[in-house]
Amino acid sequence: FLSFVSSLGYTLKGNIKNIKPTTIQKILNELKDKKEYKILSNLLLRCMQKAVYKPENIGHYGLASPCYTHFTSPIRRYPDTTVHRLLRTYLFNHDMKPSTLHKWQEKLIYIADWSSARERSADDCEREVEDMKMAEYMESHIGEEYEGMISSVMSFGLFVELPNMVEGLVPIREMDDYFVYDEEQMTLTGEKSKIRYKLGDKVLIKVIRASKETRNIDFEIIKKL
């Protein structure tokens, strides 16, 4: 991530060899006024390890807190309920017998793994529904042109995000040149045209396909802005 940000010409301060939560916050603060901020903040988020539930207290990296647990949320999650049960066992039932502790130690491993798996499943479901509804919406806009920003660069094409948050793919097989993919710099460069596409570039696109059934939206690039 830091290498890519540097390739855009931005110089970041701080000790990048010893990344702390405060370092990440400083990086985001330095980038907040840049036109690519939304793209870069999402990229930084994807670079970070996915959080999982564990029986042991390992603190909270983002909050820079050595002590952290789930307690409540807008929707009552199972980890929240588990913490409530533990507190009730200790505070109200005053049950700290070795047998009780041993029972919970065994249960918490299973509960943590199960909760992590269900959260991943819920996230996948949410993404699929979002993709389906975006494709359904764009089915009635095929042939229309929009300005957008390149949100991701892959070996198979470019993802472009429109101002209305709809994201579609520009398949590399349908681009009018042979494009070379640079994974480190996250760019596609035309072999003949020398046109170079990177994260944050603004482009004018046309909607060429959209399917609710496949949850796919395809664009074609008209020109780089």
Question: Which residues are covered by each model-predicted region?
Answer:
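Short peripheral tails and domain-boundary helices/loops at the edges of structured domains
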Residues: K223-L225
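Append "with occasional cross-activation on large, charged helical scaffolds in nucleic-acid assemblies
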Residues: F1-P163, L169, D176, V180, ...
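Low-complexity, polar-biased intrinsically disordered regions enriched in Pro/Ser/Thr/Gly
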Residues: Q185-E191
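C-terminal structured domains
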Residues: K192-K194, K198
